[in-house]
């Protein structure tokens, strides 16, 4: 086959070419002084058990079949080299990276071995050795690029000097050509920020802060235009030249990138069809009778050649046989034998360097918590809409109540009791819901960030949860005081300053409980909309059972009465009822005494309503406060446990 103009290796790599198939770990380093490293993957297979039918079909759901996602995959790569893993969707590219990085969940069966410098790593060592960049870039949108990297450095590295972090961040900003956007916001779809390519480089920069020697990137060019994708790949090639191992999965690379990669691997249905240098690829497929046509993109040509066409049964059988032929030819080729020889050789060399773990000198638990708290606070404080809604959403609800009730009366004929009961019912029912709205809107992004950063070993998920809780407390207190100050005095509730304080404290608790209950559920349920529905259902149910406003508690069935003791609404309602009705005197028209002929005027004092609705609540006032506020630390501790379990399940 005639050599194509864009396939010339000299124009792409020149003297930096480092593609030898034989191991060169004992020949020196890429940079002349640093030790060379190697990564070997030997006969890695992964299978999972899938249920035959859907969950509602009990018979077929009980039946399982084993699905082989990876089948005896073997790779070898050294420092200074970049490997590109090609394959169509579902070919096993991401699963292979997960297997190499130790991130595969234990719900499947993993076989085979992964060696770094000839040493087989334990599962708990992969996180400290391999840097893994996922497809999606997850950032806090209101932070600048410099702040994002600085907080990451502060979470990963211990130092008593601020200059240390500044120098570390400046170094990676320069290395990845991000200095010109260092002080720009990351941004999101709501407001502009840096470009997609720059976001990808920020993700890479965050990984470089710990100086990893093995970097893996899953689809780093997804969603980028051709020119930006080309720049990202060239950047990764340059990073590999600095004594790093770089492995990337790419779905559809440009032809100009063909000779920039030192190794190219092709996966089809979990089987390795080829793995070698670009020159070896051209020769291998040429010998198999499939030369790349002139002026064709070799990536596209070989991807089509090694894919199974499922448009028709005949084409599927034909293309699958071709793939099986190519896979068999590769396993019998000298290229495959050299891979296995290199892996075996590195396992027995005595002069190999130590395993290249990332820089690991993390700060203490409380230092990390402080960094997370500062980061969360700075990010959310810059979002004006978030700050305003946090402070005034309760007030907006209160204004509707004011416009509706105007001012409560002491005249029984004008609904003195009914208006107060309706008001308290709305207050206890709505405040948890506003707390839930805060958590549903703000925490999912923090959860996504913590899911990614905790897998990188920066901190544990419960620490992010606790940072959010500490951040939310002052906002909730201020918002409740603003709401109470306007509503309490405007609506004409019991005119006493101490009662106003009790009123505010009683409404702060359900607001926090609603928000923290939502956090607990967000640790168990991924979809925020489902969490929204669950919290709303629990809030309404608790209000019906525990308040005593809809049905007298003494007349409830015993199971519901017992269940009411586990609802925070019971204690909150009793506090508010005592706080408002104790010492209150009613009138009936112009009379201060009861009118026997008028059932609406049967009460003259608020204590009568207390004993009818919440018997004994007056003597339990302090106890109710203690029980009500005990829900808050209970939910926080439960949330920490849930996120600890979430951490474990994601890493399984």
From Swiss-Prot:
Regions of compositional bias (Polar residues) in chain numbering: 18-30
Membrane topology: Multi-pass membrane protein
GO biological process, alphabetically ordered: cholesterol efflux; cholesterol homeostasis; negative regulation of intestinal cholesterol absorption; negative regulation of intestinal phytosterol absorption; response to ionizing radiation; response to muscle activity; response to nutrient; response to nutrient levels
UniProt topological domain (Extracellular) ranges: 406-422, 491-501, 551-624
Reactions mediated catalytically: cholesterol(in) + ATP + H2O = cholesterol(out) + ADP + phosphate + H(+); sitosterol(in) + ATP + H2O = sitosterol(out) + ADP + phosphate + H(+)
One Pfam family matching this protein: ABC2_membrane_7
Chain segments carrying region Disordered: 1-30
GO MF annotation list: ABC-type transporter activity; ATP binding; ATP hydrolysis activity; ATPase-coupled transmembrane transporter activity; cholesterol transfer activity; metal ion binding; protein heterodimerization activity
SMART domains named in the record: AAA
PTM note: N-glycosylated. N-glycosylation is important for efficient export out of the endoplasmic reticulum.
Positions of transmembrane segments: 385-405, 423-443, 469-490, 502-522, 530-550, 625-645
Residues that bind ATP: 87-94
Enzyme class, UniProt record, top EC level: translocase
Cellular compartment(s): Cell membrane; Apical cell membrane
Domain ABC transmembrane type-2: 389-646
Cofactor(s) the protein needs: Mg(2+)
Keyword Membrane in record: yes
Domain ABC transporter: 39-294
UniProt GO cellular component terms: apical part of cell; apical plasma membrane; ATP-binding cassette (ABC) transporter complex; membrane; plasma membrane; receptor complex
Similarity comment: Belongs to the ABC transporter superfamily. ABCG family. Eye pigment precursor importer (TC 3.A.1.204) subfamily.
Domain commentary: The Walker motif (consensus sequence G-X-X-G-X-G-K-[ST]-T) is expected to bind ATP. Within this motif, the conserved Lys is essential for transport activity mediated by the heterodimer with ABCG8.
Function: ABCG5 and ABCG8 form an obligate heterodimer that mediates Mg(2+)- and ATP-dependent sterol transport across the cell membrane. Plays an essential role in the selective transport of dietary plant sterols and cholesterol in and out of the enterocytes and in the selective sterol excretion by the liver into bile. Required for normal sterol homeostasis. The heterodimer with ABCG8 has ATPase activity.
Protein name per Swiss-Prot or TrEMBL: ATP-binding cassette sub-family G member 5
Originating species: Rattus norvegicus (Rat)
Phylogenetic lineage: Eukaryota, Metazoa, Chordata, Craniata, Vertebrata
């Amino acid at each position: 086959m005639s050599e194509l103009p864009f396939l010339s290796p000299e124009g792409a790599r020149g003297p930096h070419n480092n593609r030898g198939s034989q191991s060169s770990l004992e020949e020196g380093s890429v940079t002349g002084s640093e030790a060379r490293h190697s990564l070997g993957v030997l006969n890695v297979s992964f299978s999972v058990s899938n249920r035959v039918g859907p969950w509602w079909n009990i018979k077929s759901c009980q039946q399982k079949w084993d699905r082989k996602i990876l089948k005896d995959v073997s790779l070898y790569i050294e420092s200074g080299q970049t490997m590109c893993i090609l394959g169509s969707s579902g070919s096993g590219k991401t699963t292979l990276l997960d297997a190499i990085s130790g991130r595969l969940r234990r719900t499947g069966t993993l076989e085979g071995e992964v060696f770094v410098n000839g040493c087989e790593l334990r599962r708990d060592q992969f996180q400290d050795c391999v840097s893994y960049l996922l497809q999606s870039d997850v950032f806090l949108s209101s932070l600048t690029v410099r702040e994002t990297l600085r907080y990451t450095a502060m979470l990963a590295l211990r130092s008593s000097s601020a200059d240390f972090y500044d120098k570390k961040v400046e170094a990676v900003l320069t290395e990845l050509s991000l200095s010109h956007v260092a002080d720009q916001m990351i941004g999101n779809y709501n407001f502009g920020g840096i470009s997609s390519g720059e976001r990808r480089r920020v993700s890479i920069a965050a990984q470089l802060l710990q100086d990893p020697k093995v970097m893996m990137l899953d689809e780093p060019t997804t969603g980028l235009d051709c020119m930006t994708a080309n720049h990202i790949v060239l950047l990764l090639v340059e990073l590999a030249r600095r004594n790093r191992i770089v492995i990337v999965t790419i779905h559809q690379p440009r032809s100009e990138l063909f000779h920039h990669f030192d190794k190219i691997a092709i996966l089809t249905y979990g089987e390795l069809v080829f793995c070698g240098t670009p020159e070896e690829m051209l020769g291998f497929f040429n010998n198999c009778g499939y030369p790349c046509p002139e002026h064709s993109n070799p990536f596209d040509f070989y991807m089509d050649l090694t894919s199974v066409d499922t448009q028709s049964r005949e084409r599927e059988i034909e293309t699958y046989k071709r793939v099986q032929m190519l896979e068999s030819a590769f396993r019998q080729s000298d290229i495959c034998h050299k891979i296995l020889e290199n892996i075996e050789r590195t396992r027995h060399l005595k002069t190999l360097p130590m395993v290249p773990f990332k820089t690991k000198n993390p700060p203490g638990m409380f230092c990390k918590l402080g960094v997370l708290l500062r980061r969360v606070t700075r990010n959310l404080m810059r979002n004006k809409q978030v700050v305003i809604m946090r402070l005034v959403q309760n007030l907006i609800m209160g204004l509707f109540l004011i416009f509706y009730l105007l001012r409560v009366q002491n005249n029984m004929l004008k609904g003195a009791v009914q208006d107060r009961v309706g008001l308290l019912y709305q207050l206890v029912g709505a405040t948890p819901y506003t707390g839930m709205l805060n958590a549903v809107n703000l925490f999912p992004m923090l959860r996504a960030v913590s899911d990614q950063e905790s897998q990188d070993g920066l901190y544990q998920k419960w620490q992010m949860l606790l940072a959010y809780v500490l951040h939310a407390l002052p906002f909730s207190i201020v918002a409740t005081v603003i709401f109470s100050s306007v509503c309490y005095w405007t609506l004409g509730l019991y005119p006493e300053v101490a009662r106003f304080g009790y009123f505010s404290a009683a409404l702060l608790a359900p607001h926090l409980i609603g928000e923290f209950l939502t956090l607990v559920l967000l640790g168990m349920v991924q979809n925020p909309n489902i969490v929204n529905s669950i919290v709303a259902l629990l809030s309404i149910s608790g209000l019906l059972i525990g308040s005593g406003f809809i049905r007298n508690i003494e007349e409830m069935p015993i199971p519901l009465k017992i269940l009411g003791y586990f609802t925070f609404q019971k204690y909150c309602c009793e506090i508010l009822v005592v706080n408002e009705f104790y010492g209150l005197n009613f009138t009936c028209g112009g009379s201060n005494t009861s009118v026997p002929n008028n059932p609406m005027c049967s009460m003259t004092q608020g204590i009568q309503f207390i004993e009818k609705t919440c018997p004994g609540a007056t003597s339990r006032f302090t106890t109710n406060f203690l029980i009500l506020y005990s829900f808050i630390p209970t939910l926080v501790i439960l949330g920490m446990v849930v996120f600890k379990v979430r951490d474990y399940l994601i890493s399984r």
